[in-house]
Amino acid sequence: MESKHFCLYPIYMDSARSLSEGRKYRKEICVQRPRYHEIKNALEKLEIEYTDEPSKKHPRDFFNSGRFRIKKEYGRLFVIEGISQTIAELRSKPGSSEETSREKQSRGKAVHGVVQNGVYVENKLNLVRKKKAKKKK
């Protein structure tokens, strides 16, 4: 029995990710780092019926929550292209720039991070790992 819905996680539309990291669609129709509330606003603006599940998490993007179940009758690519265009329009409007506190803090500063177990971890405090002392013979 085939489902009447398809699932959409924000990671599926993230142009900053590779296919092996979880992106599902072409980079040309994706947006860089889409957030849950941006996708929700875009779906409401496009008047597409959806069910949002804010507590659901994608296994490869565990720190960002949110999933949408959208009816297949709209067409997957049509929905993805519409959402990405709407998000781009919302981001380009002056005065509606919604930056997270992390983006505001990192503006003008060089924030470095490390990839651990496939997850990027920011080093906000610029902590440095202690070097091991060499044993004397």
Curated annotation (Swiss-Prot):
Instruction: Specify the superkingdom.
Output: Eukaryota
- Which Gene3D superfamilies does this chain map to? Signal recognition particle, SRP19-like subunit (3.30.56.30)
- Chief localization class? cytoplasm
Q: Which GO terms describe its molecular function?
A: 7S RNA binding
Pfam families cross-referenced by the UniProt entry: SRP19
InterPro entries in the cross-refs: Signal_recog_particle_SRP19, SRP19-like_sf
Subcellular localization: Cytoplasm
- What protein family is recorded? Belongs to the SRP19 family.
Subunit relationships = Fungal signal recognition particle consists of a 7S RNA molecule (scR1) and at least six protein subunits: SRP72, SRP68, SRP54, SEC65, SRP21 and SRP14.
Q: What is this protein called?
A: Signal recognition particle SEC65 subunit
